[in-house]
UniProtKB/Swiss-Prot annotation:
The active site is at residues 37, 175. Pathway: Carbohydrate degradation. Binds 1 divalent metal cation per subunit. Active with Fe(2+), and probably also with Mn(2+), Zn(2+) and Co(2+). The gene is RPE. A divalent metal cation binds at residues 35, 37, 70, 175. Its EC number is 5.1.3.1. Catalyzes the reversible epimerization of D-ribulose 5-phosphate to D-xylulose 5-phosphate. This is Ribulose-phosphate 3-epimerase. Homodimer. It holds the Pfam family Ribul_P_3_epim. One of its GO terms (molecular function) is D-ribulose-phosphate 3-epimerase activity.
Length: 228
């Protein structure tokens, strides 16, 4: 079985001038992991941060928090070792960004990280299937990657459902426009890792939002297990 339902705030939506404090606020509010978006200005139009920031956060936050790296970069092979050294726990690269996923998966594992494989909305989920048994997590984008605050794309849910049906033990993450109004659709489709940005980061009570998201996700997972 996939691991239990986990909620990962997207720190790109935080006050970046106080990034360490914002991460601590999320962890203190019950976040299961931190989702860190790395953008290079090539694979996506925007630019965020790289491994020096990850290294600084690891030093400030200690070894316990789980860093889920979403690598929206055109050369994901280039950043595996730097991210591993910086303290990343999971390295999710885009299928669209490499011609040799197998070698990249091997490199990530050899550098001591878990492997995530992401697909954009326009990429058919079947292209991910040959690699599903070699990875720890599949990331289904529910917005076009590159910018925060976009509208959730409900028509991505069949991808999640297909993955859950075909690969019951796979962690499936959704990212983009996910919050209290949309999480039930993700959970019912089979997602068990929920990335949420502004819905958590901009809430006056992030703990209550995290708990709500987790409860909806857990209830859907329990229902799926009963329906088998």
């Amino acid at each position: 079985m996939a691991s239990g339902c986990k909620i990962g705030p997207s720190i790109l939506n935080s006050d970046l001038a106080n990034l360490g404090a914002e991460c601590l606020r999320m962890l203190d509010s019950g976040a299961d992991y931190l989702h860190l978006d790395v953008m290079d200005g090539h694979f996506v139009p925007n630019i965020t941060f790289g491994h020096p920031v990850v290294e600084s956060l690891r030093k400030q936050l200690g070894q316990d928090p789980f860093f889920d790296m979403h690598m929206m970069v055109s050369k994901p092979e280039q950043w595996v070792k730097p991210m591993a050294v910086a303290g990343a726990n999971q390295y999710a690269f885009h299928l669209e960004a490499t011609e040799n996923p197998g070698a990249l998966i091997k490199d990530i594992r050899e550098n001591g990280m878990k492997v995530g494989l992401a697909i954009k909305p326009g990429t058919s989920v079947e292209y991910l299937a040959p690699w599903a048994n070699q990875i720890d997590m599949a990331l289904v984008m529910t917005v076009e990657p590159g910018f925060g605050g976009q509208k959730f794309m409900e028509d991505m849910m069949p991808k999640v459902h297909w993955l859950r049906t075909q690969f019951p033990s796979l962690d499936i993450e959704v990212d983009g426009g996910v919050g209290p109004d949309t999480v039930h659709k993700c959970a019912e489709a089979g997602a068990n890792m929920i990335v949420s940005g502004s819905a958590i980061m901009r809430s006056e009570d992030p703990r209550s939002v995290i708990n709500l998201l987790r409860n909806v996700c857990s209830e859907a997972a329990q229902k799926r297990s009963l329906d088998r």
